[in-house]
Design a protein with these regions (language model features):
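A glycine-rich, hydrophobic/aromatic-adjacent loop/helix-cap motif
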Residues: 2-179
Length: 179
């Protein structure tokens, strides 16, 4: 049987599929993904140290995510596709697979959210970027509105442009402390 796999997006994936483009079909279904706690608390090396959205269980607001269909029918291939786009190891891609009952995430809470979401959907699996906040580790400061703004103010040139574009382009309903 053919499996239908959802790719869940909440950050730059929505406006920059990059090398994932040939591996998905159709348009983004806006705000039809699971509701996740999101914050701009990931310092992204890929994006020149701009702040990027990450699933974050700190004091953050739940935000709706978006869905696009993978062309893959095998969860492992969908994981590798997303890992390649994110320039990260497959272990940093979360997944739930209804066919095998297997799943992976750094956080049990996230797996529960995805199992609940997929339960009454027409998908057999889902993959998502399962990064973890690293703001404290990379800046040495606790994440809050002030320290995040200070970090953004410290950026210049290309990193600053990247940061502005990312925060501006994030979906309108991603309503976080920083935004």
């Amino acid at each position: 049987i053919m499996s239908k796999i959802a790719v869940i997006g909440f950050g730059s994936l929505l406006w920059d599929l990059d090398d994932l483009a040939p591996k998905v079909s159709g348009e983004w279904k806006m705000y039809e993904g699971p509701v996740l706690p999101l914050e701009f608390s990931l310092v992204s090396r890929k994006r020149h140290y701009a702040l990027a959205l990450v699933i974050d269980y700190g004091d953050v607001a739940p935000c709706p995510t978006c869905v696009i269909d993978s062309v893959r029918s095998e969860i492992g291939a969908a994981i590798v596709d997303l890992a390649n786009r994110e320039r990260m190891a497959p272990t940093n891609i979360g997944f739930v697979d209804r066919n095998t009952g297997e799943s992976h995430s750094h956080r049990e809470e996230t797996r529960k959210i995805f199992w609940n979401w997929i339960d009454d959907r027409d998908y057999d699996g889902a993959v998502w970027t399962d990064g973890e906040r690293n703001f404290e580790a990379l800046t040495g400061k606790a994440f809050n509105l002030q320290t995040a703004q200070d970090h953004l103010r410290s950026l210049q040139g290309i990193p600053l442009e990247e940061a502005r574009r990312y925060i501006r382009n994030a979906p309108a309903r991603v309503d976080t402390t920083l935004r």
